[in-house]
Amino acid sequence: MSKVEFKKETGPREVFCGLTSIVWLHRRMPDAFFLVVGSRTCAHLIQSAAGVMIFAEPRFGTAILEEKDLAGLADAHEELDRVVNDLIERRPEIKTLFLVGSCPSEVIKLDLATVAEKLNKRFLGQVRFVNYSGSGIETTFTQGEDGALKALIPLMESSNEEKLLLVGTLANNVEDRFKKIFRNLGISNIESFPPRQSTELPKIGKNTKVLLTQPYLSDTVRDLKHRGCDIISAPFPLGIEGSTQWFLAAAKAFKIGELKVHEIISPLIKRAKLALESHKEILKGKRLFLLPESQLEISLARFLHNECEMDLIEVGTPYLNKDLMKEEINLLPDNTKIVEGQHVEKQLDRVRNSNPDLVVCGMGLANPLEAEGISTKWSIEMVFSPIHGIDQAADLAGLFSKPLKRNQILTSKTLVTH
């Protein structure tokens, strides 16, 4: 392991809650519906993040907890039953309904697990109900997906059939390219979790080899291990380096030689390196500060330093699972400073004192930092953009070169007021 400096920090934090993950999960599984049991604030958050107007009837919604519910003056369970009945009647195409806990439902101790159990009996054979928490008390941002996948694992049947299981939501076109490469390598039985249809859950067992596509799935990994799955240790497929090591790790697990892997991915690497050059010219030597939000920060830091030659000031991450991130940490330069958790005021002081060229942060911090003359990039864009794989390396670098390029254009000469 490289000589990395680890620090843990606690205090006030500035991150999205786990409800945000509904935005990409509902697109991934079009036969599922995500019902948040929460406040109007929860509803506004998801609707704004998804960019979908509610009259478009998206596959998510919020059962609003009113003041009388929070005060214990009404039976929230009865009201939730009514909402679910109306929803199923209105949307008969729903096959899986996720009951998603929020801060308000956690505060009043609403037992969504029991609610889901009762609803499963009532709607047996029609709709499947599962529950998880997206509460900001318990989760941050991407951990919502971890909770959703963990909730589905008990529903997955057992099988000893050998297969490669890609775990973590990917853009469909990226996933299709990955599967094509694996088939060219000779791995024919490949499935994904979450699947594209919520009712088509993969079967798992002792011959299931799990390859993670996202670094924020600690609980999911633990439960898959308990089901006997073998977890392949690898960096994550961000950039040329990470994706190459990711493919090599999968090939090794299936006893496929490295030469075969390089033969198949070499043309992709050659094209990606050429496409990366223009972004590298802008990013090279620039100082980068990553604030914690998505748990992608360590992988992004590795890519931006090793392939784009940026200098790392500090790499923040909401949580750090050293087992899952071991291969990533090994690729970081010596003396990289990784800070787990957050005390937002202290971290902002370090940002100002270090004079970075670019700060990767949440939307809530971006505008104030921009007002201070500090260039920023929203971390949420990394989750909503198709950034995985060798052939996406230039697009990934472009997300970071764009704000720096913008600043080069918006000089004091172009910002003259009349």
Curated annotation (Swiss-Prot):
Keyword annotations of the record: 4Fe-4S, ATP-binding, Chlorophyll biosynthesis, Iron, Iron-sulfur, Metal-binding, Nucleotide-binding, Oxidoreductase, Photosynthesis
Top-rank EC class of the record's enzyme: oxidoreductase
Function: Component of the dark-operative protochlorophyllide reductase (DPOR) that uses Mg-ATP and reduced ferredoxin to reduce ring D of protochlorophyllide (Pchlide) to form chlorophyllide a (Chlide). This reaction is light-independent. The NB-protein (ChlN-ChlB) is the catalytic component of the complex.
Sample GO molecular function, one term: 4 iron, 4 sulfur cluster binding
Catalytic activity: chlorophyllide a + oxidized 2[4Fe-4S]-[ferredoxin] + 2 ADP + 2 phosphate = protochlorophyllide a + reduced 2[4Fe-4S]-[ferredoxin] + 2 ATP + 2 H2O
Signal sequence extent: none
Coiled-coil stretches noted in the UniProt entry, renumbered to this chain: none
Top-rank taxon: Bacteria
Pfam families: Oxidored_nitro
UniProt: [4Fe-4S] cluster binding residues: 17, 42, 103
Its EC number(s): 1.3.7.7
Oligomer status and interactors: Protochlorophyllide reductase is composed of three subunits; ChlL, ChlN and ChlB. Forms a heterotetramer of two ChlB and two ChlN subunits.
Gene transcribed to yield this protein: chlN
InterPro entries: LIPOR_BchN/ChlN, Nase/OxRdtase_comp1, Protochl_reductN
Protein's name in the database: Light-independent protochlorophyllide reductase subunit N
Cofactor binding, per record: Binds 1 [4Fe-4S] cluster per heterodimer. The cluster is bound at the heterodimer interface by residues from both subunits.
Required co-factors: [4Fe-4S] cluster
GO process terms (BP): light-independent chlorophyll biosynthetic process; photosynthesis, dark reaction
Gene3D superfamilies: Nitrogenase molybdenum iron protein domain
Family listed: Belongs to the BchN/ChlN family.
